Amino acid sequence: MIKRILAALVGLSLTSLVFAQSPPLFFKEVWTINGAAHAIAPGENVLTSANLELKLYGPSATASDPDKRIWISTPPTNIWTGMTTTPFAATLRDKENYVDLTGTAKVRWITRASGFHAVHPVVKLADGNYYVGEHSDANTSGFLESEFMFATQRWMKLDIERVVTKGTYGPAQDASAWMREPIDLSKVDEVGFADLIPGSGHGAGGYVNVASFEVYGKPVKRH
């Protein structure tokens, strides 16, 4: 009986320690839409948080043809990649703080995918380099909430202009392109997601939706 009580107390202490070490909510973005689903126009604000900046990457981010750009859609309000003709990435940047994504820092987001598409995490470090993470969410049966920690990821360097992965050959000409050394997540400038496959257009076929997007990590002042 005493052993059971001690085991329960130890378990409770460990649980309390985990919660005590959990980082705070750094930001939560649920997007806003004016009217029906449409291509995001240059300079259009689709953010609900005034302290965030949205960065769009890849040729489809600035395409002159609205039917080749990234869209804002609903319901729920989400970023939709179906009309993109190239790989695409979007990130969020806090105007006042970097974010420390070490330890138990995590993302919690609501996503959906079609075809072979998947949502991957993207970070821009304080040194200006971009990386895309191994984690992917590709649920096709509806919008699904999921979460993951940054510290558990393997990363590949990301050519942000084209939104394609880059790397060097490893031992025995291994072409996986994973970073061989851990990346420094203690001061991250931007956090977002990538769809590494062009969209298929209207209707089911190939795209991702990213709705509610939460990042948990410790703020680090920019100045």
Give, region by region, the residue ranges found by the protein language model.
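Positively charged n-region of N-terminal signal peptides that target proteins for export
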Residues: M1-R4
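Intrinsically disordered, low-complexity segments enriched in glycine/proline and serine/threonine
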Residues: L6-A7, T32
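Pyridoxal 5′-phosphate
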Residues: G11
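Beta-rich carbohydrate-recognition modules and glycan-binding surfaces
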Residues: Q21-H223
